[in-house]
Amino acid sequence: MTHSTLPPQPFAILAMPRTGTHYLEELVNEHPNVLSNGELLNTYDTNWPDKERLLLSDRELLERAFLRYPPHSDKKVTHVGCKINEPQFQERPSFFAELTAWPGLKVILVIRRNTLESLRSFVQARQTRQWLKFKSDSSAPPPPVMLPFATCEAYFKAADDFHARVVYAFDSSRIRLIEYERLLRDPVPCVATVLDFLGAPALQLADRGILRRQETRPLDQTVRNFHELRVHFANGPYARFFELAND
């Protein structure tokens, strides 16, 4: 692989699961100088041909991500990144500290306003084993799911703790928050914000993405015990996750 004199500037997309990071990455990768290589810590991510990389030390794995990344023949890469989801940090506890110490790293933290939507989507994907849906896919939406009280509470707390941990760990100049809802509503200006933050040249993206949302129905149609959950979490810090558009 041919590199420029200076190594590409590194970035990482961090998020809870099911927050639109695949879509964001797809759009960012339309830029001829930006390359995001998928989930670094995911054994099955096809962007990384070598599963053995996960046997490397944390430092060596980051070198693999930012210095010895898989080649991409049609790009002159000036900014290179990867994605990491919160559960993957749990599986590799020492990795977060090594990531925060990487010189010059910029972080894009993607947040979904309604964490219940994130959990519901995560459970649906695990149960159906369907993690992505493409625009050409006309299959039926996934079946509704049951979500135990304890599972919801643990997930809500994990999301709060993770977001706080990331914000606390990085200087404000090195982190940019992106809302899932804004990304869906206004993808082009949202990606322009990301590119400006990274320092990549401005580019009018075509939004030729091939991904689509797997689930568009409201929560009361996709979570079988939604109303029981709503009562359980009423008047608490997570009550807002159970508000419906027609309330």
From Swiss-Prot:
Q: Does the keyword Transferase apply?
A: yes
Enzyme nomenclature, EC number: 2.8.2.-
Question: Do the record's keywords include rRNA-binding?
Answer: no
Q: Which domain of life is it from?
A: Bacteria
Location of region: Hydrophobic: 1-17
Q: Which UniProt keywords apply?
A: Nodulation, Plasmid, Transferase
Provide a Gene Ontology MF annotation, just one.
Answer: transferase activity
Gene3D superfamilies hit by this protein: P-loop containing nucleotide triphosphate hydrolases
Provide the function of this protein. Required for the formation of sulfated nod factor. Proposed to transfer activated sulfate (PAPS) to a N-acetylglucosamine of the nod factor.
Q: What is this protein called?
A: Nodulation protein H
